[in-house]
A protein has these predicted regions:
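Phosphopantetheine-dependent thiolation modules in NRPS/PKS and related acyl-activating systems
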Residues: 5, 9-114, 118-141
């Protein structure tokens, strides 16, 4: 019997509650990131902003961003050169959740430096855009 009050019933209740909480958090995350993920392909924006940059180079940069935030590569061309990296971070972590982040910005900075051989911190600002970071990363190319 799996009725309430038994150890098995209590475990099932806890598991159901945890599952419902996880679903609610995932739905809330999708809602907060919707302004990025609901876009059509931003490839033309990247090509206009960086007409001489090879597509593969732009994609590699975007993949660094997506990887640092643990987002799917299928979201690559949902990000615009005008997007601020902090806006992406703030959409993922509303002010109440920021204390428990997964070090996405630190991971991005390390990956950026490893891949491009330049430290992004000297140019980092609260309002820095992905396009500005890409330009800084590829200025010597």
């Amino acid at each position: 019997d799996l009725s309430h009050g038994t150890p098995m019933g209590e475990v099932l209740t806890i598991l159901l509650f945890c599952g419902a909480a996880m679903l609610a958090v995932a739905a809330f995350e999708r809602f907060r990131l919707r302004r990025f993920w609901s876009r059509r392909c931003t490839g033309a924006e990247w090509r206009r902003a960086f007409p001489t940059a090879p597509k593969a180079e732009i994609w590699t940069f975007l993949d660094l961003v997506l990887s640092a935030f643990a987002f799917s590569q299928s979201k690559r061309l949902c990000l615009s050169p005008n997007d601020q990296i902090m806006a992406l971070y703030q959409a993922l972590y509303p002010s109440l959740l920021r204390a428990g982040d997964a070090m996405e910005l630190e991971t991005f900075a390390i990956s950026f430096q490893e891949h491009y051989g330049v430290d992004p911190l000297p140019v980092w600002r609260e309002d820095i855009t992905l396009g500005q970071l890409f330009s800084y990363a590829t200025k010597g190319s």
